[in-house]
Amino acid sequence: MILAIDTSSKSASCALLDGDDVIAESFCNAGVTHSATLMPMVEGLFTATGRKTDEIDMFAATSGPGSFTGVRIGASILLGLAFGKGLPCVGVSALEATALPFESFRDVIICPVMDARRGQFYNALFRNGERLTDDRAISGEDLYAGLSTGNSPVLLCGDGHALAAPFMKDLVLVDAPRDLIYPRASNVGRLARRIREASPSGTFTDLEFKPVYLRPSQAERVMSEKKQ
């Protein structure tokens, strides 16, 4: 059984999966801090299903990019739950997890966007289930410039979709179902399973799980400016 969590954006979610099948999932987009909501949500999954924590054989979480605080909270909770158990801990790209529900869309550019502040988005591009770019921090203008060189329609998803839409100008946009716009822990679990199966010799220990930050945090920027 997989326990998967996502805290990379404004929403938070957790899920229990048996393979790719969802046993139970909890999702919250109420604007409450993840540190206050996630553990009660996880506990609620076990209460509702009657499953036990010793049934877990893999942990999965979004390792970034996204909210610095959110990613750190998710990593801390994952590592706390996994401590001493010797079970695989698999980190998943939040952008890839957001794009996953749309991998069956043919010849459409799947464009997950997360608000990175400071005039940028966290973004990656996918088409026909294949990754086209690495995860990156990019301006709306540069994102449009790259997309406008092709003729494929574009599907925006992620918590930055409404902010990114005005930059898309004359591009053909495909509407995404609103309940699929945000990353879901169930898709984090599915991706983690694929990653582990693709690397059967990988250990994926809790010590190897590392958050991915594409930019320095605000605190790190302030510290760097003071040193200059």
Model feature map: region roles:
Residues 44, 84, 101, 128, ...:
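Active-site catalytic microenvironments for nucleophilic, acid-base chemistry
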Residues 60-94:
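DPxDG-like acidic metal-binding loop motif
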Residues 1-65, 182:
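N-terminal beta-alpha supersecondary unit
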Residues 21, 33, 88-183, 213, ...:
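Surface "functional belts" at beta-alpha junctions
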Residues 47-54, 82-92, 104, 199, ...:
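Phosphate-handling active-site elements
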Residues 178-211:
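Glycine-rich phosphate-binding/hydrolytic loop that grips phosphoryl groups
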